A protein has these predicted regions:
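Conserved SAM/SAH-binding loop
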Residues: 4-8, 24-25
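A short acidic, Gly/Pro-enriched loop at the edge of an enzyme's catalytic core
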Residues: 7-19
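Short catalytic micro-motifs in class I SAM-dependent methyltransferases
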Residues: 18, 23-26
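A short glycine-rich, Lys/Arg-flanked "PGG" loop and its adjoining helix->strand segment in the class I
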Residues: 26-42
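Conserved class I S-adenosyl-L-methionine
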Residues: 40-73
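Active-site capping/gating segments
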Residues: 62-100
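Conserved Class I S-adenosyl-L-methionine
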Residues: 86-141
């Protein structure tokens, strides 16, 4: 597990079999450099409905999510092996759960103080989890 820049990952060239990029920024050049031929990238990106209920509370206007479809998953030098969507609803049943969810998202830092305060006062919240999975394989030549 490494947290670092995707543009210049601190790893040797062609030394990685699998990259999992969760809600991150895709760097074709950086990933291509460190991934072995035939290696795999697993991309997890939020769908349009991901945490929509939370976003409706903390933002005055809810913008459409930047989904995997709009990121042009097809990358030169890679083959798309599989795409799948995970969509389900979950109920947070305590103030602590709502606060933990908010803190673990970038929304905590993007929302206004008023938006954060509104969410932090909730004792429960129905949320939608909407995640797009895409598996790409580096071409061998």
């Amino acid at each position: 597990w490494i947290v670092g820049t995707n543009r210049q990952p601190p790893l040797l060239h062609e030394s990685v079999d699998i990259i999992i990029c969760m809600f991150g920024f895709v760097s074709r050049e950086g990933f291509n450099k460190i991934l072995k031929p035939g290696g795999v990238i697993i991309l997890l990106d939020p769908g349009d409905e991901h945490l929509k209920q939370l976003r409706e509370i903390i933002y005055p206007v809810v913008n459409k999510q930047d989904t995997a479809d709009s990121k042009n998953i097809e990358m030169e030098g890679f083959t798309l092996l599989h795409s799948e969507k995970l969509l389900f609803n979950e109920k947070l049943t305590s103030n602590e759960q709502v606060n933990h969810l908010l803190i673990m998202t970038p929304h905590f830092y993007r929302a206004s103080k008023e938006g954060r305060d509104a969410a932090c006062q909730l004792s429960e919240l129905d949320i939608t989890v909407d995640v797009n999975f895409n598996v790409l394989q580096k071409q061998t030549s």
